Amino acid sequence: MSGGSRIQLLSPRLTNQIAAGEVVERPASVAKELLENSLDSGARRIDVEVEQGGVKLLRVRDDGSGISADDLPLALARHATSKIRELEDLEGVLSLGFRGEALASISSVARLTLTSRTASASEAWQVETEGRDMTPRVQPAAHPVGTSVEVRDLFFNTPARRKFLKAEKTEFDHLQEVIRRLALARFDVAFHLRHNGKSILSLHEAHDETARARRVGAICGGGFMEQALPIDVERNGLRLWGWVGLPTFSRSQADLQYFFVNGRAVRDKLVAHAVRQAYRDVLFNGRHPTFVLFLELEPNGVDVNVHPTKHEVRFREGRSVHDFLYGTLHRALADVRPEDHLASAPAAAAEITRPTGQQAGEFGPQGEMRLASPVLEQPQVPQHSISNGGSGAGYQYQYTPRPSQPLPAAEAQAVYREFYKPLNDDAAGPATLPQSQGDIPPLGYALAQLKGIYILAENAAGLVLVDMHAAHERIMYERLKVAMASEGLSGQPLLVPESLALSQREADCAEEHAQWFQRLGFELQRLGPETLAIRQIPALLKQAEANRLVQDVLADLMEYGTSDRIQAHLNELLGTMACHGAVRANRRLAIPEMNALLRDMENTERSGQCNHGRPTWTQMGLDDLDKLFLRGR
């Protein structure tokens, strides 16, 4: 510090402008603060008008409770709020805002006009400020019950901040994303957005499941809703509900991930880790899951006052929340079966043919198709009923899959060897298919094999195409995981124990979780305050870098209270075994073998994706086929 410098108080205008650096980053930041105030006021309709991406004009109008004339000047003062009174109030705060600094920060870097009227007032009142002039001017105005906030010329008095703004389209995209997030958080509020005089978004109140799904589709796209699983699970004071996208609807960027805690949009590391773990086995490298999820818990179980923008939260029982999120999502993804995608069939469903025989149908080298023969039975499809809309959604079939049983390790290894050896064409027996005419399995009955790669099958909805290698790879992988779980992990003692230098905190963590490491095949011994010895590692991971793996696991344990790194390494090895053991392309399968593969798919968790996240099968309904041939036009 210079000897001539003296300590002095900063002016209110300067302190507000400094604070604005945390609160007001761009027009989207302003929109977030104003919209949250509107929602906290009990608004049921919010209109947003924007010009030039929000830099020239951002106007937010609501029909909330309004602000009285006496409180208007105070509303623009820093740290003035109606939402908390004592420090203890923060433990149970449910409002989106509570610090009372947003309007003061915004008014210090823009020209702000606030007009409001309460239900008990006969007229509205208006207050204006212009950046440098921090003395508010209050005057009567015409306005319905509610509040309008108009922000013009953002950063007009701070040119350095204005230079960091992006192009108009970029700024508007950020602003629009803020509105989308809040519209997902509050289905009971209508949102309307206009940009440069053009209507961009119009969302009406959504009070039932259908309307909520329609709003999610309008914001996230119809493709998401078509590929999303609805979930709603409540346990031990925690409730998780919303929609999770199927792994086949993953994206190259994490731009379709919305997570809300008690109605507040958050981006939390613990939440992200739990979701990533749940999708671990079904996503291709570099792909990101999609979801719109809502977590509800007691307000005192989460601290929302840990980040200037309130994007991050801290859970009181972080480990319990993590395990609940992971377990719920993991189970939801694992329970997806083919029949979940086939809740209805087309109205013009044809008869299903059950071919049996020693040789599969296939396409020959010249492209001609050789059908399996002989065709012994043609069970009749049960009569379907047309729904009110005439779409054929009333068609129902009955099929009860056999219960899935844990596979002993010996059997899993036998299956691995059986599918890895060349096929003996004479060994295939007759197909074992349901005898009841009404028992049409979700994936139907195999018809033929295409180019030694795909299985063509017919079900109640139409045509099913199966990538036989990808499907069998998933089946083998799940069986090997079950086998490992039942047999446990054998350890490989090291001839020369490896020494590992750590911080004292990491060494304490390793000692605390010693039994957990032992169950996974590791034996760790503490040699000193900051030294560990690795005496044993899992036999399957003998080629892994033990030191680095243990350090990474300890980092996870200290951050999240759990780690999936060891299991991820093991699963990677099992996935390689399953890939090598799965039926190969250009291998001819008999009809009974193809049908056996279809039945195994119906009874295997996550069978819709291979180990790398690629789809294993797809459905083409009769409507899809009709469109290809222009039928019905």
Swiss-Prot record:
Recorded GO MF terms: ATP binding; ATP hydrolysis activity; ATP-dependent DNA damage sensor activity; mismatched DNA binding
Annotated GO CC locations: mismatch repair complex
Pfam families recorded: DNA_mis_repair, HATPase_c_3, MutL_C
Domain of life (superkingdom): Bacteria
First and last residue of the signal peptide: none
Function: This protein is involved in the repair of mismatches in DNA. It is required for dam-dependent methyl-directed DNA mismatch repair. May act as a 'molecular matchmaker', a protein that promotes the formation of a stable complex between two or more DNA-binding proteins in an ATP-dependent manner without itself being part of a final effector complex.
PANTHER family: DNA MISMATCH REPAIR PROTEIN MLH, PMS, MUTL, DNA MISMATCH REPAIR PROTEIN MLH1
Xref: HAMAP family: DNA_mis_repair
Family recorded in the similarity comment: Belongs to the DNA mismatch repair MutL/HexB family.
Name listed for the protein in its UniProt record: DNA mismatch repair protein MutL
Gene that encodes it: mutL
